Design a protein with these regions (language model features):
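Short, low-complexity, charge-dense intrinsically disordered segments
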Residues: 1-16
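Hydrophobic structural segments
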Residues: 15-382
Length: 382
């Protein structure tokens, strides 16, 4: 039985910031959109009631029994992990598996659990980008851009309200293309309409055809923002019936996707690059393919299990592909075209905790948040 110890730090946390769990998760769901996650994933709120009050959070890579015990001792009532505790359906809660025991202990102690997994991987400033920063890469871009997550919005706005509606759309999140925002295209034209006897038109008279100088405005948005953007459009637009069209786009989403590619400040011999990875990631069991004999300048990388991106890394012309969980036969695929480096799953994703903490502090600077001190890496090296 684990007993809760009410610490002075927890008391300070309560004095600084208490909020509803739904306020916290609503922000994270927006900052790390759940729509970005892969179909097999289960990111988001795993345990907790929306109206539950939270006062301090602990960030970890994995939720384990020791991490839950640590949270109880530190009086943290929210755990935020990279890897979800629950991937598949739980059919019973008897304590026979480690997942069941963790769930039981967390629920019993009113500890909420939130996870940000592949949606955090997809972010332009996500797990792989953090790896790239840690080893000092420049000119960082996405290795495997995501697709089918963009919509084009076309709407028609009277000239008198164009700026108001445009600003409302941009504030709702529309108009972002890569590192650019407030992106749109406008062209003037003439719109016509006739309202029936039940209408109350903003311009013109009911029952009569009316022509109005309007601006056709086009912009783009991510699919997960559709409801928010349309709500902003309808609220800012003066017409009773707002005319708009939404089109699904097949464009790659610049800035969203798996992995990164970047350039080292100075080329390194392959063994020196391996020493850099050993030092930065504290990677004690690096596996790598046969050296190519080339200097390392262009680096492709993907935090966690990224072997599926080997061919894409080769096609970028990268000298090295740094990732984890590479299978034996995958090492044959390179044919000496690229150096494959497996630095470990835990090692390549452990900096995800820093991303989560920075996001939280940015929005809630007075909310108490700490890193778990428990090493959750299940792999040991002899």
């Amino acid at each position: 039985m684990v007993t809760r110890r009410f610490t002075e730090e927890a008391q300070r946390a309560i004095e600084k910031k208490i909020m509803k769990l739904k306020e916290f998760t609503s922000y994270l769901d927006s900052a790390i959109p759940l729509a970005y996650q892969e179909s097999y994933d289960n990111s988001g709120l795993q345990i907790g009631l929306p109206d539950q009050e939270i006062h301090s959070a602990m960030i970890c890579l994995d939720v384990t029994e020791k991490v839950v015990s640590e949270a109880i001792e530190a009086d943290c009532n929210l755990l935020i992990s990279h890897h979800p505790l629950i991937f598949n359906g739980i059919k019973k809660l008897t304590g026979n598996t480690y997942t069941e025991r963790i769930l039981y202990e967390a629920v019993k102690n009113d500890i909420a659990v939130y996870s940000a997994h592949t949606n955090l991987d997809m972010l332009s400033d996500g797990v792989s980008h953090k790896m790239a920063e840690k080893i000092g890469l420049d000119k960082i871009s996405v290795l495997s851009p995501s697709d089918n997550r963009l919509l084009k919005l076309v709407t028609y706005i009277p000239e008198s309200h164009f700026e108001k509606v445009k600003i409302a759309l941009f504030e709702a999140g529309a108009g972002v293309i890569g590192n650019y925002d407030n992106c749109g295209f406008a062209v003037s034209g003439t719109g016509s309409f006739k309202g029936n006897e039940t209408t109350n038109p903003f311009v013109g008279e009911r029952g009569k055809i009316h022509s109005e100088n309007e601006i056709r405005f086009e912009t783009v948005l991510f699919t997960h923002l559709k409801a928010r953007v349309i709500k902003a459009l309808v609220e800012a637009h003066p017409y009773e019936e707002v005319a708009y069209d939404l089109y699904a786009l097949e464009n790659n989403n610049i800035g969203i996707g798996l992995g990164c590619v970047g350039i080292l400040p100075e080329p390194l011999p392959e063994m020196d690059f391996l020493n850099l990875i050993y030092s930065v990631f504290d990677a004690k069991g690096i596996r790598y393919s046969n050296p190519t004999g080339k200097m390392v300048s262009k680096v492709a990388l993907c935090g966690g299990s990224g072997a599926s991106l080997i061919n894409e890394a080769i096609h970028t012309g990268a000298d090295v592909f740094l990732t984890a969980d590479i299978k034996y036969h995958d090492f044959f695929k390179t044919e000496n075209r690229i150096l494959l480096v497996d630095a470990g799953h835990f090692e390549t994703e452990k900096f995800s905790r820093e991303i989560l903490k920075d996001l939280i502090i940015k929005k809630f600077p007075k909310f108490a948040v700490r890193f778990s001190e428990t090493n959750t890496n299940p792999i040991n090296y002899f």
